[in-house]
Amino acid sequence: MRGVLLLVLLACAGALAAAPRVVSLAPSLTEIVIELQAADLLVGVLDAGERPAALAQVPSVGRYGQLDLERLLSLKPDLILLWPASVPPAQRAQLERLGIALYS
């Protein structure tokens, strides 16, 4: 899992001139990003309890079942990390229609 996530992040980094802007909608995937020493790529996270120190300045995009889509879009992410159940199907479809890359 970590290897796949790293490959996705590296692919995005290679395809873009700047570092990819990543929003994580799954706390477990957020932890993996931190473990991979890539917390600086995170521009938004889903609140799910106490935050690691590495995320103190990263904006929230909502809570489970209460995704703030307007705030998420204002962060202009290149990639959104999520578990299939972390976002309601209607919101996931909306993100897909907007052309934001999703990894689940």
Region spans (language model):
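Positively charged n-region of N-terminal signal peptides that target proteins for export
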Residues: 1-5
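N-terminal signal peptide c-region/cleavage motif recognized by signal peptidases
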Residues: 12-14
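Nucleotide-sugar donor-binding and catalytic loop/hinge architecture
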Residues: 17-18, 95
